[in-house]
């Protein structure tokens, strides 16, 4: 794996770093909220289930951002659109910490969702179109580990600073990702595949996607719905589960979150690289099925140590499956709409899974506050569903980007 990364040119490494950090910091801004659900509920004199509507709104708005920023990236380029998007979600995160009421807070989280939705598709397209085809599996795992890396940063911030700055200060720290724009501006060039076909008409890719690639797009949406239910169903309410059902302290919750995000990072790296050898679908199936024997320890463990071990293994498997996604979706994407197709399919899946936190909170309340039961039920059903969809789905492992115009070995444009 390391020799593949060393083979990248400075510009290719810059694109990978920018895309990884963009997704890391986007996820950091999102996951700050899951650690302070209870605090926000207390601040605005409501319950946790009501506050989870902010998560629903954020996830539901992400397809809008994926579509708008994706279309803009297909028209104006990946690099400038990525910079605008990062600035926007950073500013909205800061503003969330200033919200004077629950209504304003919900509106800001809705707007944040639009900005959050734009980052993944644009960043992944920039990286995948810049690197050699033979490194896609490894880089895919790296890019997707940005998500648990962001969660890990949020957990560390919560553990170290929450007692000093409170929930509002946690959100205000979320403005720091804006500094990444300076790195992109100075170190990252535009995707060579985009430059080879620049100046496409704005919105043309969407029409073609819906007309000519409807079946492939619908499959990608179904696949990403299962992926998002699995991810959000094992992550978003886990801190609340530890706080409300097990009554663990802030420090204990933060430490467990740090542990399971290390598992997520390792899983994403391993399965991303593995998918280059055994194929995208097979890697997804193996990782999804690995979650099933872990569920009893992850959801029904009694001690902090047992739950930490279960959570580590669960996120190793969940994010292992996710480590394949950037390469898989970009390879499935039609050539002239790679800025739009992967991110839009991903975020439509997010929209369809956006009620997960509210659904799980409702199941828990209906069962006497048993969050473990709610988490286990959703995780088991969705893991099997994902494995079936991946097994019987389609794959375009190793497909060349930009036809004959981009060299698959070094990413350079060919005439």
At which residue positions do the language-model features occur?
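Helix-loop-helix hairpin linking two adjacent transmembrane segments in secondary transporters
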Residues: 143-186
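Extracytoplasmic gate region of multi-pass secondary transporters
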Residues: 34, 214-265, 353-357
């Amino acid at each position: 794996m390391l020799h593949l990364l060393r083979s990248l040119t400075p510009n290719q490494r810059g694109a990978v770093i920018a895309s990884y950090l963009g997704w890391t910091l986007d996820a950091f801004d999102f996951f700050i909220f899951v650690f302070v659900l209870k605090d926000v509920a207390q601040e605005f004199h409501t319950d946790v289930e009501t506050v989870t509507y902010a998560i629903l709104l954020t996830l539901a708005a992400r397809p809008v951002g994926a579509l708008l920023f994706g279309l803009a990236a297909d028209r104006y380029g990946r690099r400038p659109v990525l910079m605008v998007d990062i600035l926007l979600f950073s500013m909205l995160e800061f503003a969330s910490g200033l919200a004077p009421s629950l209504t304003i807070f919900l509106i800001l989280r809705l707007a944040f969702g639009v900005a959050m939705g734009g980052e993944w598709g644009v960043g992944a397209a920039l990286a995948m179109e810049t690197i050699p085809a033979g490194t896609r599996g490894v880089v895919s795992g790296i890019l997707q580990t940005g998500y648990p890396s962001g969660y890990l940063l949020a957990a560390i911030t919560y553990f170290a600073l929450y007692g000093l700055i409170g929930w509002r200060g946690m959100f205000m720290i979320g403005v720091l990702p804006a500094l990444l724009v300076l790195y992109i501006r100075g170190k990252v060039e535009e995707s060579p595949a985009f430059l080879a076909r620049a100046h496409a008409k704005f919105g043309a890719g969407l029409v073609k996607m819906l007309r000519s690639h409807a079946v492939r797009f619908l499959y990608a949406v179904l696949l990403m719905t299962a992926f998002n239910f699995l991810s959000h169903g094992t992550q978003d309410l886990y801190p609340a589960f530890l706080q409300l059902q097990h009554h663990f302290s802030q420090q204990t919750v933060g430490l467990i979150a740090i542990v399971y995000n290390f598992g997520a990072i390792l899983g994403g790296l391993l399965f991303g690289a593995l998918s280059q050898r055994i194929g995208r679908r097979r890697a997804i199936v193996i990782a999804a099925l690995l979650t099933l024997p872990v569920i009893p320890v992850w959801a029904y463990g009694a001690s902090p140590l047992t739950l930490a071990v279960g959570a580590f293994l669960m996120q190793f498997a969940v994010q292992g499956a996710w480590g394949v996604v950037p390469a898989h979706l970009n390879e499935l994407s039609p050539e002239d709409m790679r800025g739009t197709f992967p991110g839009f399919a991903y975020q439509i899946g997010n929209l369809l899974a956006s009620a997960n936190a509210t659904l799980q909170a409702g199941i828990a309340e209906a069962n006497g506050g048993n969050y473990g039961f709610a988490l286990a039920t959703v995780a088991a059903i969705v893991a099997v569903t994902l494995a079936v969809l991946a097994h019987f789905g389609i794959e375009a492992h190793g497909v060349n980007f930009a036809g004959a115009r981009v060299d698959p070995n070094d990413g350079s444009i060919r005439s």
